[in-house]
């Protein structure tokens, strides 16, 4: 839905403090499992386990009463279904994600009503859940069948199996004849799956046995001990780390390892169990930190983020391959790659060996290749980690090529995110727009993919973080829009907006500046950086298009002397605006650092103007420079350092003055100058060839007769790739540069802007190419999904005037009524807290006298309709 948050800074910080109090990432006793979304389906299966099977039926009670309580308290009060989390989405199997959500809700609701039916409690919950199933099954299975007439594998297995169990327990559903035919088709599909697949298959990440809880017993009953017990995980006693499958395994075998696993699970997760256990606890915490940073909230949680990263780094080590079950390996690889990326981004010394161990194990690679859908998030995490590649890291290069190939094979799941990752390199993405994408992505809180659905961070945390991020984003938008208006007034004041030639890029420059910088820097210095970029654009166009050589020479000399009194027309306008920018920058530095840098700034600008004049002179004389000569001048004329150094001087701590002198720049600055120049050349060689100008691509082709233009482009791209890796290493590794970290961040932001401008095309020179991004960054309200309507059912769902009586659920009731409480003395209900309530009493309208007439009727008598012939409904056990 569209959101519009009119937050003030105080409102945001109050919300931040509220969330910090709940999340407590820096708490040393933090339980990571509190961040994981519970699974209604798996919790329902644990609730069905009997504590002791060697007792009479009327003495049976659940082993895990808390799981039954969770079901009673977590039904959607309005619609009657159960689900896992707010923005719940399932593994798409090549299908529409929202459709898969409906399928998962349907199977979860079926499991929950089966659990209530088994324990003969929660009549109102059971009634609402049954009604949801009857109302929605036809729509769900009819809408989401694929073109081949089949359903996702997991759904065909789970839906049919849980439906069989429901029938065995006496639950009957009223479906249309069309719906029944579709369900029959699903049973046929399941039969084909069973005939085609083995119970346990080394190549299948989730083999049939992972769905033990819903499999026909004939598949394993003759050799139950060998099939089930031997498949239990030697490390934890689970069946494929699936609580539901392990619950079924325990009910069938009463195996002590299963019991220990289940008891440990419930102790660790008392408020609903996740669909996978155990989980990598570092992965949970890193995923929470990743969500915070990726949605633009890192500025509020700096202490908490550093605490988590320091914890992870203290356990960091280079790993050689260690054999373990594939589900553990997948989590380990996901955690290791995410830790590598986050630790490297935060300046820690980490080696690619920490996660590239998988490259040397063919079995692991085979699993990844054969189960791309199941491991897609792991593959994506590895690919993202390779964004931060330093020179000589050949393992990272191999991992990048390998994972990119896998991602290109399977783009249907999280397609938008994958396409974004593959088409737009991380180095060419701007912070502010990336934050928006993560905020709007309903799958941003996903941890992993399991049997049927995404395992997610708990919605009670991720939803609040998402809405805080949305409010923060629109708060920033409002600030940026006001600043852009002020910047536009400045451009008009100095006559730059109607100068009559060149590119008018006020909005482009401001957009690129503030969306690339951290918000703290953007709001302090973004407008000044944009002024610098605007003037560079106009001056560059003046040298390229408008000015005579005498005009250009006169302006350059005026800048070198810093005396513009004799300038006229365009030269005068440019110099006066330049003088204003330099004075503002110098005054700001003097205020913050009590130091004068005006001479350094003038020298940097003088060097830039000289490089433009030199290019104009080469063009006028038809001079063909050497490659070295061209690069030495071109890396100055692109003027990336002019922007970066001007703003770096304002950072805290102050930029080293000796690094401001032309010819004595830091290695980071030098690399920043080279990369944008070559990026620009890749997109401008055709235009410059037509104008008779030189370019690194054209020079390389000229110096190597016989080469095609594609060969020269590939050569320049290779140089850029090498310089980019070197640049990243100098920015991210402490000790390779004397520059303070904030100054490195300014250089990184500046580089990312040029990478964005020249990613596959020249976006900066286009009048329309960036308009969509500008709208999203500065104007359009953010799109966020509604918070969940799932709320605990109140103890008395219909107020003090009514009570709800449990029904005899092994036969269909004629009528369900509410009767005045005083007619039953001290009788209590068990509606919300699912304690076993075993007094089964039906209240019929004919049994009531005039004094106790029913107050409300909720369901009337319906004739039970057999769903299908018994051949389609074999017993579960």
UniProtKB/Swiss-Prot annotation:
Q: What happens when the gene is disrupted?
A: No formation of (E,E)-geranyllinalool and TMMTT detected.
Q: Which GO terms describe its biological process?
A: diterpenoid biosynthetic process; response to bacterium; response to herbivore; response to jasmonic acid; response to singlet oxygen; response to wounding
Organism for this UniProt entry? Arabidopsis thaliana (Mouse-ear cress)
Enzyme Commission designation: 4.2.3.144
Q: Which Pfam families match?
A: Terpene_synth, Terpene_synth_C
Q: In which pathway does it act?
A: Secondary metabolite biosynthesis; terpenoid biosynthesis
The gene name reads GES
Detail which positions bind Mg(2+) 3.
680, 684, 688
Q: What is this protein called?
A: (E,E)-geranyllinalool synthase
């Amino acid at each position: 839905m569209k959101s519009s948050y009119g937050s003030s800074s105080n409102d945001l910080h109050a919300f931040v403090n509220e969330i910090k109090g709940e999340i407590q990432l820096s708490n040393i006793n933090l339980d990571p499992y509190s961040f994981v979304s519970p699974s209604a389906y798996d919790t329902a299966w644990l609730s069905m386990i009997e504590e002791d099977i060697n007792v009479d039926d009327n003495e049976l009670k659940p082993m895990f009463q808390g799981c039954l309580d969770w079901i009673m308290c977590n039904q959607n009060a309005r619609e009657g279904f159960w689900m896992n989390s707010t923005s719940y989405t399932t593994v798409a199997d090549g299908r529409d994600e929202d459709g898969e959500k409906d399928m998962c809700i349907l199977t979860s609701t079926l499991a929950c009503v089966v659990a209530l039916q088994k324990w003969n409690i929660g009549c109102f919950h059971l009634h609402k859940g049954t009604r949801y199933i009857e109302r929605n099954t036809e729509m769900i299975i009819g809408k989401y069948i694929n073109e081949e007439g089949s359903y996702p594998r997991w759904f065909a297995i789970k839906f049919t199996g849980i439906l069989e169990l429901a029938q065995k327990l006496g639950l009957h559903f009223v479906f249309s004849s069309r719906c029944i035919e579709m369900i029959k088709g699903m049973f046929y599909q399941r039969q084909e799956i069973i005939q085609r697949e083995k119970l346990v298959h080394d190549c299948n990440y989730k083999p049939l046995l992972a769905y033990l809880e819903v499999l026909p017993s004939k598949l394993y009953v003759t050799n139950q001990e060998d099939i089930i017990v031997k498949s239990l995980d030697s490390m934890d006693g689970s069946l494929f780390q699936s609580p539901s499958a392990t619950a079924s395994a325990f009910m069938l075998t009463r195996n002590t390892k299963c019991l220990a696993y289940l008891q440990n699970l419930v102790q660790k997760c008392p408020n609903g169990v996740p669909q996978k256990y155990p989980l990598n606890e570092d992965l949970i915490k890193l995923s929470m930190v990743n969500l915070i940073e990726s949605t633009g909230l890192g500025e509020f949680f700096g202490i908490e983020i550093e605490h988590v990263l320091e914890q992870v780094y203290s356990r960091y080590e280079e790993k050689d391959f260690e054999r373990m079950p594939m589900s553990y390996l997948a989590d380990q690889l996901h955690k290791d790659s995410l830790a590598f990326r986050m630790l490297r981004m935060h300046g820690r010394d980490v080696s690619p060996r920490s996660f590239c161990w998988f490259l040397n194990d063919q079995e692991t690679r085979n699993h990844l290749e054969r189960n791309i859908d199941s491991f897609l998030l792991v593959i994506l995490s590895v690919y993202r980690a390779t964004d931060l590649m330093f020179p000589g890291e050949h393992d990272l290069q191999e991992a990048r090529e390998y994972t990119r190939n896998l991602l290109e094979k399977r783009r249907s799941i999280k397609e938008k995110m994958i396409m974004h990752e593959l088409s737009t390199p991380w180095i060419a993405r701007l912070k502010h727009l990336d934050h928006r994408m993560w905020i709007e992505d309903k799958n941003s809180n996903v941890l992993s993919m399991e049997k049927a659905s995404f395992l997610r961070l708990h919605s009670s945390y991720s939803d609040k973080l998402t809405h805080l991020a949305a409010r923060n984003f629109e708060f920033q938008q409002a600030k940026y829009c006001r600043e852009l208006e002020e910047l536009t007034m400045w451009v008009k004041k100095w006559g730059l907006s109607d100068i009559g030639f060149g590119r008018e890029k006020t909005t482009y420059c401001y957009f690129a500046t503030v969306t690339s910088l951290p918000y703290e820097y953007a709001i302090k210095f973004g407008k000044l950086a944009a002024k610098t970029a605007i003037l560079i654009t106009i001056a560059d166009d003046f040298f390229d298009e408008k000015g005579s050589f005498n005009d250009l020479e006169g302006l350059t000399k005026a800048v070198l002397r810093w005396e513009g009194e004799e300038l006229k027309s365009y030269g005068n306008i440019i110099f006066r605006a330049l003088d204003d920018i330099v004075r503002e920058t110098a005054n700001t530095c003097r205020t913050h650092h009590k130091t004068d840098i005006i001479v350094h700034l003038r020298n940097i600008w003088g060097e830039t103007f000289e490089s433009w004049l030199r290019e104009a002179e080469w063009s006028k004389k038809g001079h063909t420079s050497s490659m070295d000569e061209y690069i030495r001048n071109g890396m100055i004329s692109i003027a990336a350092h002019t922007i970066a150094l001007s703003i770096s001087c304002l950072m805290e701590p102050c930029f080293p003055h000796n690094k401001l002198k032309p010819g004595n720049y830091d290695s980071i600055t030098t690399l920043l100058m080279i990369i944008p120049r070559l990026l620009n050349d890749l997109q401008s060689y055709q235009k410059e060839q037509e104008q008779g100008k030189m370019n690194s691509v054209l020079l390389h082709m000229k110096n190597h007769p016989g080469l095609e233009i594609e060969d020269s482009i590939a050569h320049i791209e290779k140089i850029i790739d090498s310089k980019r890796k070197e640049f990243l290493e100098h920015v991210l590794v402490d000790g390779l540069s004397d520059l303070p970290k904030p100054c490195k961040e300014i250089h990184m932001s500046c580089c990312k802007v040029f990478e964005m401008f020249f990613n596959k095309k020249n976006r900066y020179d286009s009048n329309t190419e960036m308009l969509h991004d500008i709208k999203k960054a500065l104007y359009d309200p953010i799109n966020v999904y509604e918070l969940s309507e799932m709320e605990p059912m109140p103890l008395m769902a219909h107020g003090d005037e009514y009570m709800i009586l449990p029904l005899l659920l092994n036969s269909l009731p004629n009528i369900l009524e509410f009767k005045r409480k005083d007619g039953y003395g001290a009788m209590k209900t068990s509606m919300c807290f699912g304690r076993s309530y075993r007094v089964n009493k039906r209240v019929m309208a004919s049994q009531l006298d005039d004094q106790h007439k029913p107050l409300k009727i909720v369901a009337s008598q319906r004739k039970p309709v057999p769903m299908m012939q018994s051949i389609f409904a074999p017993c579960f056990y």
